[in-house]
Amino acid sequence: MKRKFVGAAIGGALAVAGAPVALSAVGFTGAGIAAGSIAAKMMSAAAIANGGGIAAGGLVATLQSVGVLGLSTITNIILVAVGTATGARAEGSMGASREQESGPQDPPQELQEPQEPPSCKKQDLNLGKFVGAAIGGALAVAGAPIALSAVGFTGAGIAAGSIAAKMMSAAAIANGGGIAAGGLVATLQSVGILGLSTSTNIILGAVGAATGATAAGAMGACREQEPGLQDLQQEPKEPQEPQELQKQQEPQEPQELQKQQETQETQETQELQKTQEPPSYEK
């Protein structure tokens, strides 16, 4: 449960902070559309399709306005809701524990076969980023109605006893019994019933794609193989017999020194034999 709260907080923060990052990455910056960027190509294609102009309220105009002026408070609230739901779900699935089986347990880690180190190829990391971007974008767009429905803004209206009902009650008390048009509760209620607009879905998809690609890149970072693992992967050497080990440990004398010792021993033997011979008595 604690991990879900942490994941929800991180997801909400990344959703709000990731929107300007994602828009700036494709070229919708605070100073305008960056030359040679994806945004510039989108603007060129939209101008050709509209006979030389950019349609007001269209995709390019909306993203350009968001890049220059930033997101509205309502859009940020929706992003927080989507990021919170997505982060909590991701953290809950990653932190789910496996129940311990009642049968025989697995052997210790030292006795298991050493696994190959993770692949550090650049192609694998790029593929992981593309997959993470696709999953993040899909989750962001699909998670908006789920997040709104979870707090009580459903397609049939505000659910009784939900967080949305408490928000509506507080707003009604603050406004003297009515709900202000264009306010937070009215906007979320409208989104819950009618759904998000195309431009908002595009922004959500961009934020989710940027967040998913960043997460996939961080999770796919390779760790270098530790030097001790190579020693563990080598086959153990057979123990040597004591006699062979003793032979290896005995120092071998040089051949010249051995010849000198043999010559010296021969001379000493000859001198000893001469001294031991009995004297001869000749007549």
Curated annotation (Swiss-Prot):
Swiss-Prot/TrEMBL keywords: Antiviral defense, Apoptosis, Immunity, Innate immunity, Membrane, Mitochondrion, Mitochondrion inner membrane, Transit peptide, Transmembrane, Transmembrane helix
Organelle targeting sequence: 1-90
Biased composition annotated in UniProt, kind: Low complexity: 242-283
GO BP of this protein: defense response to virus; innate immune response; intrinsic apoptotic signaling pathway
Location, primary (coarse class): mitochondrion
Region (Disordered): 90-120, 227-283
GO-annotated molecular function: identical protein binding
Localisation per UniProt entry: Mitochondrion inner membrane
GO CC field: mitochondrial inner membrane
Topology term for the membrane: Multi-pass membrane protein
Pfam family for this entry, one: Ifi-6-16
Xref: Gene3D superfamilies: 6.10.110.10
Transmembrane annotation, as ranges: 130-150, 176-196, 202-222
Induction info: Up-regulated by type-I interferon. Up-regulated by poly(I:C).
Family: Belongs to the IFI6/IFI27 family.
Its biological purpose: Functions in the intrinsic apoptotic signaling pathway and may have an interferon-induced antiviral activity.
Subunit structure: Homooligomer. Interacts with BAK1. Interacts with BAX. Interacts with adenine nucleotide translocase.
Protein name: Interferon alpha-inducible protein 27-like protein 2B
Native organism: Mus musculus
Lineage, top ranks: Eukaryota, Metazoa, Chordata, Craniata, Vertebrata
Protein's gene: Ifi27l2b
